[in-house]
Amino acid sequence: MNDNFKKQPHHLIYEELLQQGITLGITTRGDGLSDYPKNAFNMARYIDDRPYNITQHQLQLAEEIAFDRKNWVFPIQTHENKVACITKDDIGTNIDTLTDALHGIDAMYTYDSNVLLTMCYADCVPVYFYSTKHHFIALAHAGWRGTYTEIVKEVLKHVNFDLKDLHVVIGPSTSSSYEINDDIKNKFETLPIDSANYIETRGRDRHGIDLKKANAALLIYYGVPKENIYTTAYATSEHLELFFSYRLEKGQTGRMLAFIGQQ
């Protein structure tokens, strides 16, 4: 696949950004220690897996991306739209064990160097933000709830520079095969973007939704230049050899870890 995300042993990396001091990527599912599912490279401590496995996977990833795990930060995601400002004081949060810190956070941003923002995914959209000019990075977790509640808009509220200097990467997530019902479709139709561009009715109470397109449309609506947004062609629901898919695997699966940091 011709994509800016390049395959590595246990992750995909946005390779061209490395020269700019940005480490941006997402883990893949295979060649791990977990039995959930078998031989999975699961990165989530909050599912039925041995803590040892997660720690070993973290150490492996830290070596592959050359970013010490002591500098990672992980929130407790709850499918909402709250954003946290992260500083070097937060590094190490929820990496060895889960705590009450950063609970209910589905987006983070920082202007600090040597901090790796991380969150878990298994169909939801990872939205990465960066500006090398202003030394800003952010990461958002946008499932249908986060998309509907405009989590990308909430992140943009914390950008204190001209949006022409902001770049956004929309990462691997479910495709338009993801279906919603009438009630959820009606919610999306209240957003300030044309739902016809990302929702397709397929039958009674059945509508396909492309959450990548919805988030891109929201970003453009709120002022991010279209040419500054990159959307990967990778889809969790279409590349099960690479990714976990919560919906296709009926919840019995692991989680990938999306990450972004700046040197």
From Swiss-Prot:
InterPro entries: Cu_polyphenol_OxRdtase, Cu_polyphenol_OxRdtase_sf, Cytotoxic_necrot_fac-like_cat
Cofactor(s) this protein requires: Cu(2+); Zn(2+)
Record's catalysed reaction(s): adenosine + phosphate = alpha-D-ribose 1-phosphate + adenine; S-methyl-5'-thioadenosine + phosphate = 5-(methylsulfanyl)-alpha-D-ribose 1-phosphate + adenine; inosine + phosphate = alpha-D-ribose 1-phosphate + hypoxanthine; adenosine + H2O + H(+) = inosine + NH4(+)
Keywords, sorted A to Z: Copper, Hydrolase, Metal-binding, Oxidoreductase, Transferase, Zinc
Biological function: Purine nucleoside enzyme that catalyzes the phosphorolysis of adenosine and inosine nucleosides, yielding D-ribose 1-phosphate and the respective free bases, adenine and hypoxanthine. Also catalyzes the phosphorolysis of S-methyl-5'-thioadenosine into adenine and S-methyl-5-thio-alpha-D-ribose 1-phosphate. Also has adenosine deaminase activity.
Enzyme Commission number: 2.4.2.1, 3.5.4.4, 2.4.2.28
Family the entry assigns: Belongs to the purine nucleoside phosphorylase YfiH/LACC1 family.
UniProt name for this protein: Purine nucleoside phosphorylase SACOL1200
Native source organism of the sequence: Staphylococcus aureus (strain COL)
Entry keyword annotation includes Oxidoreductase: yes
Binding site for Zn(2+): 79, 124, 141
